[in-house]
Amino acid sequence: YKQHRDPKSLDAALAEAAPNGVDGNFENVGGEILNAVLRRMNAFGRVALCGMISGYDGVPIPLSNPSLMLTQRLRVEGFIVSEHMDVWPEALKELGTLVATGRLKYRETIAPRIEDAPQAFLGLLKGKNFGKQLVKLL
């Protein structure tokens, strides 16, 4: 998404990546990313909302075409991690195994000093990091 900052470019990239449309989307970003994915969703697709970082700065996140949720008969559901703490140990074990075996890969951006934390946080809100944003404390 970082190299596709405008809707046309993002639409083209998604069309290339998913020429047959999208059946499921795990959404953490919102904003233009969500708008672009909704335009590619297949009928009866599912959207799991787990974050909307594009709106964490307090600016409302507009949907460019909310009627797509109706016309495509999409199922959109929000998930809050803290509501599923009963399965946390099981999920942690399974995800840990996937990371350890290389089947699940992660990326992170590390700010080298605690003094860099404010700038790292602002960069997180502006999409300047890649993956999880961390700050080295020691």
Regions found by a protein language model. Give the residues of each.
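Adenosine-nucleotide cofactor-binding segment
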Residues: 1-36, 82
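Short acidic-hydrophobic, aromatic-tinged amphipathic segments that line or gate anion-handling sites
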Residues: 1-6, 109-116
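Short, amphipathic alpha-helical "lid/cap" segments that border enzyme active or binding sites
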Residues: 11, 92, 114-118
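CheY-like receiver
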Residues: 13-17, 98, 120-123
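Short conserved AdoMet
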Residues: 19, 42, 129
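Non-transmembrane alpha-helical segments in soluble domains
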Residues: 26, 38, 96, 118-122
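Glycine-rich phosphate-binding loop and adjacent beta-alpha segment
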Residues: 32-104, 137-138
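C-terminal capping/lid region of NAD(P)-dependent oxidoreductase domains
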Residues: 103-110, 118-138
